[in-house]
From Swiss-Prot:
Gene expressing this chain: ompP2
Family of the protein in this entry: Belongs to the Gram-negative porin family.
Subunit structure: Homotrimer.
Name assigned to this protein: Outer membrane protein P2
Keywords on record: Cell outer membrane, Ion transport, Membrane, Porin, Signal, Transmembrane, Transmembrane beta strand, Transport
Function of the protein: Forms pores that allow passive diffusion of small molecules across the outer membrane.
Pfam families documented for this protein: Porin_4
Cell location: Cell outer membrane
Domain of life: Bacteria
């Protein structure tokens, strides 16, 4: 009998939990190790930055390793520590297979109670991360972090005491600061340069966000709002003038359980305040679907229309589409093929109209452990 989409999603969460190996379990303490190795073979073509040739690659696709330790105190109270690393390209060198360095993606501690919620401190995802519903494996056309940061150095609270409902709030702190004071900054007053401890230009100084998502009874609904402050670099305006972004993300979807079909509509809006410059407004809408074609095989896709505009200034419109098929060869082995196409049209009064195109297609394999 064909599984419903709801059962498929529940099964996916169960499989995800099963991927982690329990290496220690005694007296209320549980330690798990898990992760995945992911490889993708791809072909891409772009006219952005005057690129005119196609490029093929065989590379790492977000391979990762994590360790999670949970200590149960009793009466529903617990503490948890989580560390996740990723394989990425080296910052220097010419390697393009993305296996050059190991970095820390997430590292946080949690104190919680099953009925009261949990407090999370460290480098972690925020409530905005899980708001939109669109599915992708690699070429996601939604850029949610442009509207609200989806992770960072944060203090967060999450409440899951009501079945199907998640409520959350996060306070973001600066994560990228200068480590040293340069000679220019240490010299004459007003000289440009780096000062140890100061936030790096155009990086997050602080921010706050709240959100809620409901996922039950075949209905998906979510919304998040965030206000994020950035450090503008006054001495060197070429590095950027962004001061503050007020953004919102939302989703609305419905599961047709008997058909194995999920349809959704994601959207976002942001207003960017620039230092002594005109403000910028952005928004997007993105209808999408996920369909269980047969057991262990799923088809998914979404379309996005996005617009950025400055009063009496540059206007950018982007249309993008993504389509993919995945198949589970084994409960811990997933293969997929995914493609995306984006067309961006930029209009400036003195420069005319410029059109850029980008397309990518890839075949990937993930092995979980």
């Amino acid at each position: 009998m064909k599984k419903t989409l709801a059962a498929l999603i529940v099964g996916a969460f169960a499989a995800s939990a099963a991927n982690a190996a329990v290496v220690y379990n005694n007296e209320g303490t549980n330690v798990e190790l898990g992760g995945r190795l992911s490889i993708i073979a791809e072909q891409s073509n772009s006219t952005i930055k005057d690129q005119k040739q196609q490029h093929g690659a065989l590379r790492n696709q977000s391979s990762r390793f994590h360790i999670k330790a949970t200590h149960n105190f009793g009466d529903g109270f617990y503490a948890q520590g989580y560390l996740e690393t990723r394989l990425v390209s080296a910052q220097s060198g010419t390697e393009s297979d993305n296996f050059g360095h190991i970095i820390t993606k997430y590292a946080y501690v949690t104190l919680g109670n099953k009925a009261l919620g949990e407090v999370k401190l460290g480098r972690a995802k925020t409530i905005a991360d899980g708001i939109t519903s669109a599915e992708d494996k690699e070429y996601g056309v939604l850029n949610n972090s442009k509207y609200i940061p989806i992770d960072g150095n944060t203090v967060g609270y999450t409440f899951k005491g009501i079945d199907g409902l998640v409520l959350g709030a996060n306070y973001l702190l600066a994560q990228e600061r200068y480590k040293y004071t340069t000679a220019a900054a240490a010299g004459a007053a007003g000289a440009a340069g780096a000062v140890a401890g100061e936030v790096y230009p155009q990086k997050i100084s602080n921010g706050v966000q709240v959100g809620a998502k409901y996922d039950a009874n075949n209905i998906i609904a979510g919304i998040a709002y965030g206000r994020t402050n950035y450090r503008e670099d006054i001495a060197s305006p070429d590095l950027g003038k962004k001061q503050q972004v007020n953004g919102a993300l939302s989703t609305l979807g419905y599961r047709f359980s008997d058909l194995g079909l999920l349809v959704s509509l994601d959207s976002g809006y942001a207003k960017t305040k620039n230092y002594k410059d005109k403000h910028e407004k952005s928004y997007f809408v993105s209808p999408g679907f996920q369909y269980e074609l047969m057991e262990d095989t799923n088809v998914y896709g979404n379309f996005k229309y996005e617009r950025d505009s400055v009063d009496q200034g540059k206007k950018t419109r982007e249309q993008a589409v993504l389509f993919g098929v995945d198949h589970k060869l084994h409960k811990q082995v997933l293969t997929y093929i995914e493609g995306a196409y984006a067309r961006t049209r930029t209009t400036e009064s003195k420069k005319g109209v410029k059109t850029e195109k980008e397309k990518s297609v890839g075949v990937g394999l993930r092995v979980y452990f």
